[in-house]
Every structure is written in structure tokens, then in C-alpha cells.
Amino acid sequence: MTGKKQGTSRHSSLVTRHPGATAPVTGVILAGGLGRRMGGVDKGLQLLNGRPMAARVLSRLAPQVDEVLINANQNLERYKLLGCRVVPDQLGGYAGPLAGLHRGLSEARHELVVTVPCDSPFLPEDLVARLAAPLHDESVDLAVARTGIQAHPVFCLCRRRLLPHLTAFLQDGGRKIDAWYASLNVVEVAFDDEAAAFSNINTAEELRTAETGQRLPGE
């Protein structure tokens, strides 16, 4: 499983569950980080105009998938109030997004698994439909979102069958998401028409900016 392909996406105006997909999808909201750039707070539970960011992500993701898991490593009971199964990392030490993906693949009920970060409340309402299109080709392992020349590796859709491969990578000490992707057949899906949807909120200042409706840096 080697190489990376550049892909163009199928655009859909629908906001219901990924039309035309051949298999159901599990969604995983990644909320397992330490929020260091926001002062060590749990970012997914920070309020954006009165609602936790993770709740806003959930409202965008849930119509597109068949199951939602939340990967979190603290405040588990508060995350459970959002109505989803909450699954902490199996690896200790806050090992990063790959640890969250690993747990998601371990717990997913469906063969296709999409991940999104908890701090991106504006994610596209057709994210899953567009990422799923390249995986109609069985040789493709994983699809990742891209805007311009910038890939967004945490916005990915992959196959559950990759779990043993990811487990071996993590057991060998691998932690960098790009390094794992380099060993797979990855297609990058262009979202140039929705670049602002991938804006994430990393700092208290960016949270205040989002609350006032101003454009975030990089939009």
C-alpha cells in the first residue's frame, strides 16, 4: 500500500447521509487532545455562542453518517450528555489523533470510518459524500480533505480493515499522522469551494472571533 493520488471530488448539495455510498459509515469526533494552545482546557466542551463546540460538530456530522463515536480522554460523562458512545484512547499519554483513530476503528460498527476534529464546528455538510467517492475503488485505503495546497489530515475517511496496520505502526512508536499516511494508498479530495469550512478554533482569541462572526485567520 504505497503512493498518494491527487483526487477531485464529487460535489453534492445534499446534506443527508452520503448519497450513493455503498456502505454505512461510522463518524468519530476527535476530542482527545489536551488543548494546550487554549490554555489546557477541553476544547470540545468550550462554548461557541452557547453550545459546546463538539455539539456543533455533531450536528453537522450526524446527518452524514450511520453512527457517531466521540473519542475523549477527560470529562467523559459530559461528553456522554451529547448522546453518543464515548471511547477514550487505548494508548496512554495523549498520543495524538492517530490514537483516536485507532480507538475509533476498534469500536466502529461499520467498514468505513470518517474522523473530524472537535474544534472545527463549520465542517462541510457534504464532507462524507465527497470523501467516500474515491473509496468506491477498492485499491484506495483512505481519502483526506484538501484545500488549495493544504491537506487536512484529520478530516479523513478510511477503511476499518486498516486497524491491524495502524496498530503495528503505533506499537513501533509511530505517532505522526503523515508518516502513517505515507505507507497507504491515499487520495486527496479537493474542497476549494468550501475552504472556510475547515477553519479550526485553537485559541481563546479564535473562539471570540468565531462568536462575533468574524473571519478566522486563514479563511
Protein language model regions, located:
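Residue-level detector of alpha-helical transmembrane segments in integral membrane proteins
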Residues: 2-3, 11-12, 90, 146
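Ala/Thr-enriched low-complexity intrinsically disordered regions
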Residues: 2, 8, 16, 21-23, ...
